[in-house]
């Protein structure tokens, strides 16, 4: 029997369940990571923050955040920060994360928020399936450490 994964708005899911999933998938030490520092003090974009449910049980989440890039020449460029993408450890490699990514990027396009999207993640995976690269991020300064090859972006508006 084939499982049917239901996607829903993240704000329709219990916040404690989301936090517990994030702990299991990413570790309880995740709050000190650079991506968390980047989005500190901002609210997630509701239309781009989704949950995946399997028979009502939370199995994965994705969130996006509005951030800005301040260029050395004074330009301020709005960027959509994608992540975290969290999948229940026992369900990883089931295609749920890829399904969430596709739905999130489609929603970003519909909302006009796909001109500049960034994330920190596995370069082979995110380039192969979604076109993210580190080509334009080498000179970016972030509020914490990051492995440069994992700082990825896509979109015509990426500085």
Label the model's feature ranges.
Residues 1-37, 43-59, 74, 151-152, ...:
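Short amphipathic alpha-helix that is part of the acyltransferase structural core
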Residues 40-44, 142-145:
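A short beta-turn/loop motif at secondary-structure boundaries
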Residues 49-51, 57-68, 78-86:
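Conserved beta-strand in the GNAT
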Residues 57, 75, 88-99, 111:
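Conserved glycine-rich acetyl-CoA-binding loop
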Residues 68-82, 92, 113:
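A conserved beta-turn-beta hairpin within the catalytic core of GNAT-like acetyltransferases
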Residues 82, 87, 93-106, 119:
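Conserved acetyl-CoA-binding loop-helix of GNAT-fold acetyltransferases
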Residues 110-147:
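Conserved active-site alpha-helix within GNAT-family acetyltransferase domains
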């Amino acid at each position: 029997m084939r499982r049917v994964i239901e996607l829903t708005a993240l704000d329709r899911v219990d916040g404690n369940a989301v936090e517990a999933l994030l702990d299991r998938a990413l570790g309880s030490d995740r709050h000190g990571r650079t991506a968390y520092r980047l989005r500190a003090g901002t609210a997630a974009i509701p239309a781009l923050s989704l949950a995946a449910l399997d028979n009502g049980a939370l199995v994965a989440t994705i969130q996006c955040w509005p951030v800005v890039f301040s260029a050395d020449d004074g330009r301020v460029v709005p960027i959509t920060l994608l992540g975290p993408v969290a999948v229940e450890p026992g369900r990883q490699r089931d295609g749920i994360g890829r399904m969430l990514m596709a739905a999130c990027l489609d929603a970003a396009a519909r909302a006009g928020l796909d001109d500049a999207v960034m994330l920190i993640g596995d370069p082979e995976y995110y380039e192969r399936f979604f076109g993210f690269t580190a080509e334009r991020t080498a000179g970016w300064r972030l509020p914490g450490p990051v492995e440069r090859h994992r700082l990825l972006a896509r979109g015509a508006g990426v500085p």
